[in-house]
């Protein structure tokens, strides 16, 4: 942490948010932006963990993030969007210097242009089957919702069924083919600067990268000490608590699809007719995580290997 969050005043955050609001209200377009909800969060998570094994762990993880929800009016039609799209915000673990690294003075105007074009775009109807390419925002959400949560072993055992839902997996799912050989999904809390960063979980177990899916085969689940003991393996450090007086439960950290060997341009060049959905503004998923629905925000028609016009809200 280069710039201590304890030295950041409310006035500093308000000043940045006023600047951001100025970028939005001065945006020259034929859509109006009558309502803006903007926020900056910062926190220092401090933990001191002690157990009967003789473990003593002190950790401090600072985090900062920027969030926004903006209402747009185009020809009397209201819609909401966020910058960045998808409501997740811009976030990092680190000091106040991370907010500066977002370069909001350039980022916000660039995203407003994209948002304006997306809102004004028209829907496309396809009679035939088409190829769909999704951007990192949607790929990350798919990894989170369809791999992260259903791979939490306590959920698989029915521990959270009444509140958080169930899983489509069984406890004996290791070795099951779940995707093509191109699919690699990991969960890694050790990535420096990430929002999901931690070095020890809340049962005192050292964190590590968990390879959930390898070449389309399920190879690991997210475990705490209890669920791992039921499988006669070691916990992989996924037990986490929101507060000191709350029971730790199994939760993912940074869950993602591993990069492959193709660049985006190469993927697009192979598509004769399709859609590239870069990000999203709406999604739904069932309690067992089997079925999901994603509605694109910034999206483009693909024709003969090239990006074409904007497409409105592809599903």
Predicted features, each with a name:
Residues 161-315:
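Dual-mode signal for accessory low-complexity, basic/Gly-rich regions
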Residues 1-198, 205, 214-217, 304-306:
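Active-site bordering "gate/hinge" segments
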